[in-house]
């Protein structure tokens, strides 16, 4: 199968994007304490994630607590949870489909066309996963920036962009690149197969027995 390094690079990037998506979903550093104004000197750091919030005080170990009530969560947080969970599931499905489409795996036998379609499907799912990651990450970042510059919000309630958001953006970019490589591999493989013309087979010349018999009879009659 041609363009083999292309599919390997696409699957590796897809795997890295899946790991980054899972880490982004689980990490609590989506919203972190903002050290501005009179809040520059503080003795504690506050992290807020999709599933828990963590507080780290001076000379005290990190303390994390899961959100106790699902109904009390803001709609933006609930939507981000749902989208990130869907993204993790899609990335796992895309990776499994991509593995089935590899040259060494005999799930579809030696059918190169079927393998190319599997890799193309995997690439589309990776791109879709990147979109699902990009939406909640960018939405949360927009809310943080909007509240940060809102003078009506107290300084102690303002937050900054956490490391999980940057990891989410990086994961989405990796997923887009990996999915694009797999889709490109599928297109290149289809073009390659489109240039293959069937080789004409050798046909055994057909002889007409009746014609040969008639010719022989005429020849024998002429000699008589």
Swiss-Prot record:
Q: Which Gene3D superfamilies match?
A: 1.20.140.150
Result of changing residue 45 to A:
Decreased transepithelial resistance, no effect on anion selectivity
Gene Ontology molecular functions = channel activity; chloride channel activity; identical protein binding; paracellular tight junction channel activity; structural molecule activity
What spans does the record annotate as topological domain Extracellular, numbered to this chain?
29-81, 146-164
Q: Which GO terms describe its cellular component?
A: basolateral plasma membrane; bicellular tight junction; chloride channel complex; plasma membrane; tight junction
Q: Name one GO biological process term.
A: paracellular transport
Quote the subcellular location field of this record: Cell junction, Tight junction; Basolateral cell membrane
Q: Which residues lie on this side of the membrane: Cytoplasmic?
A: 1-7, 103-124, 186-224
Q: How does it sit in the membrane?
A: Multi-pass membrane protein
Q: State the source organism's domain of life.
A: Eukaryota
Pfam families according to UniProt: PMP22_Claudin
Q: How does it assemble?
A: Cannot form tight junction strands on its own. Interacts with OCLN.
UniProt lists the family membership as follows:
Belongs to the claudin family.
Q: What does this protein do?
A: Channel-forming tight junction protein with selectivity for anions, including chloride and hydrogencarbonate, and for solutes smaller than 9 Angstrom in diameter. In the kidney proximal tubule, may be involved in paracellular reabsorption of filtered anions. Does not affect water permeability.
What protein name is recorded for this chain? Claudin-17
Provenance organism:
Homo sapiens (Human)
Its gene name is CLDN17
